[in-house]
């Protein structure tokens, strides 16, 4: 709960100034809390309007900000159920926001004592009531009508004095004598202005209609006055004037709750009776009012239906003539209602069009006078001044533009007063009509010439727009024609493609049929050729066996059993040929069906057969394919014949090698041969098409992937391989301790000797250079820094002393090494840089030598050393070695520094060696590639 919730603020006029004060606090009862939860009224900022017709000196800060439609329904209920502080706020100003929404909003806070005020207000319904216009049929009309009453000046003064006595705030009546005389009956809702004659006639008719029920109203009025006097006496005793102090109202509680509930029930009952009386009065007044007026037709229709129902209930024996008259009357009324609605809709449309046109004309042509606009302006002024006479801005109900005026009936002020006030306003508006207004429009400073120029521009722009529209239409038409043409071409293309597809399909089917016929013919020819070859082989084998028998007979062997075996074998072979001839059609069908698979599957035929098939015509290919083996028809006949001949030769050689006396061994060999042939025939019957795997030689040699590279890439690869091997050999040689001592003992004589050897091998280098012709041998590749040149020179010269196992490889590497040496010698002649080679030559320095290092620019440094001195060092290396003989060292610090540097160099060298051995990437090759790419 926020600080300040529940406080009520008021404005009070003191010495002509508005001041904000706290109103006295009253505790709500449980019923009021429940009803407050049902109908919550939100708080909004204070809104005060000071006008000339102000009737109030205080204004409540509780201003309802609730949904308007919900407020319509709950106006009567909140007036009956909420026991809160009630003030009727009278203000002549208007609220345009609510007038457009057809809303009735009453600003209220109802207390237990002012519910008596509502009763008095409701009992005063017998006063002369102005004529009401028929309203639209909405569900809240009766509720609104029953909750709206009129007050006389005496009753209003009585209510205000009662509220002052009860301590709910001071109400100062600031109205003048002129206002008291003019405002005899102020109504609580905002009613639009009506013509004078309508108000006068309605007033007279309603007073006449209200006279029959006066006696009932007097009875109700008398009871209400008695209750009001009792309540006033009790309020005078209980509620005394309390100052508007926040501390004087804290902790005050409501008493006599049971009495309050009884009063509220009695008031509600009386209100219900009064609502019923008002409803009857309204029906009576509407029944005898002018039924043919177009504005009253809508409500009269409902009244006619109610009257007809009542008549049927009261007078059961109705005549047919009366019913016919009523039906005609209802039809005529319906027709009039429809015509009136149609006419109003048309007038509304015409009026809205004319109003829009006049508004734009006034806005753009301020030099012309528009009487229609002036009349509308005067009517708007009249409306504003008439609305200023209304009591509260929260109770306005103005008609919408699209609807009929629907003021709630029974609560209207006297028309004579309104007409008296509206007449001077109308005269003032008419008097101001011909005068020009002071609003400056867009064309106020333009002369007629500029207006004409604008008109010409507008016409030109319209013509331009028409031309653009015509052009757009033309483009659209062209696009449509192009689209139609394109669709037509696409359809023709689709038809042509369909015809071509059908033609191709038909041709394909014909080709397949021809291919099948050709394959069938080929299979037939193949089978015939196969049988002829088989018969020829059998005949040749029989002739060989007969020749063998004759040879054995000449040598004196017994050949009777061989002759018997030969006859049995001939009979068996004849039987097998007959059976195979019977199975020829089946084989042809099998081969014809299996031929497509044979084309796509693994080929087990002879490779030479495929070559012949490509080269020879179909007949030749048929003959070649027809040559088959007994065990497998797919094996070529030539190959099978060769294998059979080879087997027979082996058997003959074995028979010749055996002893002639041992007839049994020879007989067993013949029996084995017979069994072998019988087994082959059985296998052929079981699976005549069993493929023979791994009997054909491959068509091409196996070519490794490295040999499939282009020629120049293969050359580069070979060169890099040779160079890499050379570098690895150099590294191995340098790290070899034997070669280190040799490297240490190199003299200028040895280098000159190597140069002569390299010159002698120059011819071999040229022979190698001619087929290679790669950048690795060219001079541009070796145009690198002097350090790399000398290191390459040293490593390549060391290759000459390395023993190689492979003689061919030795020749190649030596020739390449000599070539590199020659080229590097030629290019390193003008160089002046002496490299620092990582060797252990530092161990053999003379201790007596100066500490300072000689200049690297001295070309004669190495030549200055005497050959005899170097030879002496090499001879006495073990004796004068500082590591072996530490007594020779005079400068220990220098020796330690040298040893430390040597250890670091050795570690680096070993690490480089490991990297090169593992990655097989030589250091010098990378350096040469980098230098060549930079240049």
From Swiss-Prot:
Compositionally biased intervals (Polar residues): 76-96, 590-602, 783-794
Disordered: region residues: 76-103, 470-491, 577-602, 738-794
Null allele phenotype: Mice lacking Ccdc66 are viable but display degeneration of the retina. Initial formation of the retina is normal up to postnatal stage P10. Malformation of photoreceptors develops around P13. The degeneration progresses slowly until 3 months after birth, when the outer nuclear layer is reduced to 5-6 rows. From 5 to 7 months, only a thin outer nuclear and photoreceptor layer with severely shrunken outer and inner segments is preserved. It is associated with impaired photoreceptor function with early visual impairment detectable 1 month after birth and progressing slightly until 7 months.
Tissue-specific expression: Widely expressed. Expressed in retina by rod photoreceptors but also detected in outer plexiform and ganglion cell layers (at protein level).
Coiled-coil region list: 462-555
GO cellular component, one term: microtubule
Modified residues (Phosphoserine): 366, 595
Composition bias type Basic and acidic residues, residue spans: 473-491, 752-782
Entry protein name: Coiled-coil domain-containing protein 66
One Pfam family linked to the record: CCDC66
Modified residues (Phosphothreonine): 114
Organism: Mus musculus (Mouse)
Main location: cytoplasm
């Amino acid at each position: 709960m926020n600080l300040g919730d529940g406080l009520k603020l008021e404005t009070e006029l003191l010495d002509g100034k508005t001041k904000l004060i706290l109103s006295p606090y009253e505790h709500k009862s449980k019923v009021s809390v429940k009803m407050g939860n049902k109908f919550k009224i939100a708080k909004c900022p204070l809104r005060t309007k000071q006008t000339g017709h102000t009737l109030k000196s205080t204004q409540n800060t509780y201003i309802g900000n609730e949904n308007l439609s919900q407020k319509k329904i709950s106006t009567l209920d909140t007036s009956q159920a909420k026991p809160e502080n009630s003030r009727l706020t009278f203000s002549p100003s208007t609220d345009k926001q609510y007038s457009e929404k057809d809303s009735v909003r009453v600003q209220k806070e109802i207390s237990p004592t002012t519910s008596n005020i509502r009763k008095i207000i409701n009992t005063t319904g017998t006063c002369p009531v102005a004529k009401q216009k028929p309203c639209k049929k909405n569900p809240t009309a009766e509720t609104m009508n029953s909750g709206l009453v009129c007050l006389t000046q005496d009753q209003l003064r009585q209510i205000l004095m009662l509220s002052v006595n009860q301590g709910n705030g001071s109400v100062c009546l600031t109205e003048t004598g002129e206002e008291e005389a003019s405002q005899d009956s102020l109504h609580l809702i905002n009613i639009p202005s009506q013509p004078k004659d309508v108000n006068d006639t309605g007033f007279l008719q309603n007073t006449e209609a209200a006279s029959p029920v006066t006696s009932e109203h007097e009875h109700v009025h008398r009871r209400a006055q008695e209750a009001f006097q009792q309540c006033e006496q009790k309020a005078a005793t209980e509620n005394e004037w309390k100052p508007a102090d926040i501390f004087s109202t804290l902790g005050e509680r409501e008493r006599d709750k049971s009495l309050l509930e009884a009063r509220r029930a009695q008031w509600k009952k009386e209100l219900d009776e009064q609502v019923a009386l008002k409803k009857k009065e309204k029906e009576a007044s509407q029944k005898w009012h002018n039924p043919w007026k177009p504005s009253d037709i809508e409500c009269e229709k409902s009244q006619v239906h109610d009257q007809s129902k009542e008549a049927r209930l009261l007078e059961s024996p109705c005549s047919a003539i009366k019913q016919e008259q009523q039906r005609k009357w209802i039809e005529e009324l319906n027709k009039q209602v429809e015509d009136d609605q149609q006419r109003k809709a048309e007038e509304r449309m015409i009026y809205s069009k004319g109003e829009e046109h006049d508004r734009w004309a006034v806005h753009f042509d301020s030099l012309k006078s528009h009487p229609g606009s002036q009349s509308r302006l005067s009517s708007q002024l009249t409306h504003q001044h008439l609305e200023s006479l209304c009591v509260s801005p929260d109770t306005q109900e103005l008609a919408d533009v699209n609807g009929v005026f629907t003021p709630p009936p029974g609560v209207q002020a006297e028309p004579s007063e309104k007409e008296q006030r509206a007449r001077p306003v109308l005269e003032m508006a008419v008097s101001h009509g011909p005068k020009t207004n002071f609003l400056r429009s867009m064309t106020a400073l333009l002369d007629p010439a500029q207006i004409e120029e604008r008109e010409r521009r507008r016409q030109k722009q319209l013509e331009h727009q028409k031309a653009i529209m015509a052009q757009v239409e033309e483009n659209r038409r062209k696009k449509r024609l192009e689209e139609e043409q394109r669709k037509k071409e696409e359809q023709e293309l689709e038809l042509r493609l369909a015809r071509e597809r059908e033609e191709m399909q038909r041709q394909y089917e014909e080709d397949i049929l021809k291919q099948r016929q050709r394959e069938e013919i080929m299979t037939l020819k193949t089978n015939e050729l196969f049988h002829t070859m088989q018969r020829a082989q059998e005949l040749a084998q029989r002739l060989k066996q007969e020749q063998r028998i004759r040879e054995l007979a000449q040598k004196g062997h017994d050949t009777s059993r061989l002759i018997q075996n030969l006859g049995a074998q001939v009979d068996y072979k004849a039987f097998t040929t007959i059976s195979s001839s019977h199975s020829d059609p089946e084989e042809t069908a099998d081969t014809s069906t299996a031929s497509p698979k044979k084309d796509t599957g693994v080929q087990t035929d002879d490779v030479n057969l495929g070559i012949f098939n490509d080269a020879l015509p179909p007949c030749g290919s048929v003959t070649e394919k027809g040559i088959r083996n007994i065990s497998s028809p797919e094996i070529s006949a030539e190959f099978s014949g060769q294998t059979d001949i080879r087997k027979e030769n082996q058997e003959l050689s074995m028979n010749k090698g055996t002893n002639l006396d041992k007839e049994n061994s020879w007989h067993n060999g013949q029996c084995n041969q017979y069994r072998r042939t019988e087994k082959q025939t059985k296998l052929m019957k079981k699976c005549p098409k069993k493929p023979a795997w791994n009997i054909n030689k491959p068509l091409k040699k196996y070519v490794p992937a490295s040999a499939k590279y282009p020629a120049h890439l293969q050359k580069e690869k070979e060169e890099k391989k040779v160079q890499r091997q050379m570098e690895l050999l150099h590294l191995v040689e340098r790290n070899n301790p034997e070669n280190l001592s040799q490297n240490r003992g190199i003299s200028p004589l040895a280098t000159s000797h190597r140069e002569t050897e390299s010159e002698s091998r120059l011819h071999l280098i040229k022979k190698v250079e001619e087929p290679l012709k790669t950048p690795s041998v060219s001079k541009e590749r070796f145009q690198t820094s002097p350090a790399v040149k000398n290191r390459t020179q040293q490593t390549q010269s060391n290759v000459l002393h390395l023993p190689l196992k492979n003689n061919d490889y030795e020749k190649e590497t030596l020739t390449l090494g000599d070539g590199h040496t020659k080229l590097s010698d030629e290019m390193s002649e003008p160089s002046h840089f002496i490299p620092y080679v990582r060797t252990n030559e530092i161990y053999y320095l003379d201790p007596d030598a100066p500490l300072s290092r000689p200049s690297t620019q001295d070309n004669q440094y190495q030549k200055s050393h005497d050959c005899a001195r170097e030879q002496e060092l090499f001879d006495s290396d073990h004796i004068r070695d500082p590591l072996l003989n530490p007594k020779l060292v005079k400068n220990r610090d220098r020796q330690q520094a040298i040893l430390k540097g040597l250890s670091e160099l050795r570690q680096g060298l070993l690490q480089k060696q490991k990297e090169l051995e593992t990655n097989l990437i030589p250091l010098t090759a990378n350096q040469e590639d980098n230098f060549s790419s930079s240049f």
